[in-house]
Structures are given as C-alpha cells and as structure tokens.
Amino acid sequence: VEALFTVDEETGLTGAFELGEEMLTGKYLINLDSEDEGEIFIGCAGGIDTIATFRYTMEEAPKNYSFFRVDVSDLQGGHSGDDIDKGRVNSNKTVARLLWDGMQSFELKLSYFNGGNLRNAIPREAYAIFGVPTRFKSEFVKRYDLFAADLKAEFRFREPNFKITLNEMPEVDQVLDARTQFGLVYSLVGVPNGVIAMSFAMPGLVETSTNLASVKFEGDDRIVVTTSQRSSVESAKVYASQMIESVFALAGAEVSHSEGYPGWAPNPQSKLLEITVASYEKLFGVKPKVRAIHAGLECGLFLEKYPHLEMVSFGPTLRGVHSPDERLEIATVPKFWDLLADILKKVE
C-alpha cells in the first residue's frame, strides 16, 4: 500500500501539480477527499481561475458629499463547486448592485470595496465605502431602505439570515477615479456568476459554472478581482474563462488566468469501482450512489500523470465546506473507515 499526501489542495493544488510521474507504482488510487457518505465519486470538474486587475488612482473627495458604509453579511456561502447549484447569494454581486443603482441616480463616488476571500468559496460577506452629494442624502437613504427591503424579499427563501446594513461614515478624504469606478462596478454587475450549463451526459450534474470569489484593494494602485470557472467539459471550461475575461477586458482591466487543472472523466467499468460498490453493499446492506461531482478533486491531475490509474473517491459527510460553518458528521466516520479497510483487503 502506498499513501500519497499532498499540500495546498484547498488554494492551489500545488502538491498535485508537483507530483512526479514515477512516484506511484500502484494501479488503483482511492481518494479520500469527498464529502457525502454513501456516495462514491468517479468523476469531477476541471477548473481555472480568471483574475482581473484594475489599475486605479485616488482623487480628492468632492465637497459637500456624505459618506456611508454598506455591509452585506450572514449569507450561507459554501463551496463554489458543490454548492453552486443551490442558488446561494453572492455578497460581491449584492454590494455591486447597490453601487450601480447609486451611480445612476445619486452621483455616487466609490472609495473602497472589499468582499470574499477564498477563490473556491462562494463569498458570504462584502462591504463598500462611498459617498453621495449631501443634497441627495435623505433621498438616497429612502432609496436604500426600499432596496434593502426588496433584497430581503428576493432572498427570503434561499438566504433567510441575510443582512444588509448602512451606516454613515466620518468624512472621507479620497475616492476612486471615475474611469476605474465605472469599469469596476459595471463589470461586477455584468459578469456571469453561478451555473452556466447543466450536464446532458449526467442529468442533475452541473456541467459549467463560474464564481465571483473576491474583490480586493491591493497596494495603493490595484484592485484585484478573482473568479473561478469549473466544467466537466474542457472546451466549456476554456470558453467560460474567455467569457469572464471579455467582460473585464471591456471594463478596462488587465486579465490573466491560472494554469488550471483537468477534470476526471468517469470510468463506470472500473474494477476498483466494482470492488468499492460490492464492499459497501456487503457492509451496510444498501448500494451506494455512484456519481460525479462539480468540484475540483486532485484526481484529474493524478490521471494526467498516471493515465492507467483506476480511481474512486469517498469520505465522511462534511457540510459548509470552505466556510466558517464547516462541520463533520461524526456518525459517518466509522462507516468511512470500515469501507476503506474492507476495500484494501480486497484489492490485489
């Protein structure tokens, strides 16, 4: 038995990328990185990150402006692959909607925007600092109240804990230059987010998606917007990244892409899968579900370097992955362990 431990799986797949082509000698690989007990995974999506960088300058804040901070919080967030079909609200998108509306009607000036963190998580919090002419202050606050009420009604079934707050700020000295503000806000509103296509090969499986992961001011001259695209079809993954690039390029950003990673094409005739299903049925008296997942597993990279490998992936039940609410269902751990031990006894 060989044991393969990798580093940096959550943020960059560095360990899997650096795996040598002559390190493994086995013909079977059992990946222990899945999140639903009772389900055996035999395929996954490939992924790529698309990063937009806006170069900006700060200008002196105009006179007679009142400044505010808007916060969006308490969204569910979740994994940007496995949870992308659940309709989770994106905090970056939500803040951008308010800014866009303010630009149309109230001569809004943006000073700061911060939202999201991990590239592979649906962002659950974001905030922005901005100003409107003091003569529009009371009218803007009324518009905000209507906007917040509309959002709470819009999100009430999918985000019951959603919060949006508006607080007046002390005087702000600087605001973003007008060109960058326009490009940033319009692209955040316009860029696709969520499910792009469902799979025709495996009904119920998301084929292609994109996630507006984070918006960060970096240094004193850059705003970096990080997005991630996933697909079980390589050409669709590339096209999704081109779609995202096009929106940000039109908005004046410099756009780059990560190296990306391949998907894992299912092999329903795998001997290892046959052994795994038989072991599960013997141990627990029911057949496991066999499916693919719309998330990035290292298996695609392993298969690229070891094309002869037969692979399955399973694990105990996890929820809220890649969010502060991540948790493990302890009762599923013994079943996970017993299944692994039984499979290892049977493989040759």
Show which residues each predicted segment covers.
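His/Asp/Glu-rich mid-to-C-terminal helical/loop segments that flank catalytic regions of hydrolases
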Residues: 21-22, 87-105, 133-137, 180-189, ...
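Active-site-adjacent substrate-binding region
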Residues: 83, 88-92, 96-114, 258, ...
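A short beta-alpha structural unit
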Residues: 127-129, 163-175, 213, 224-234, ...
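Long, well-ordered mid-to-C-terminal structural blocks that present hydrophobic/aromatic surfaces
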Residues: 187-250
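Zn-dependent metallopeptidase/amidohydrolase metal-coordination segment
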Residues: 200, 207-221, 228, 283-343
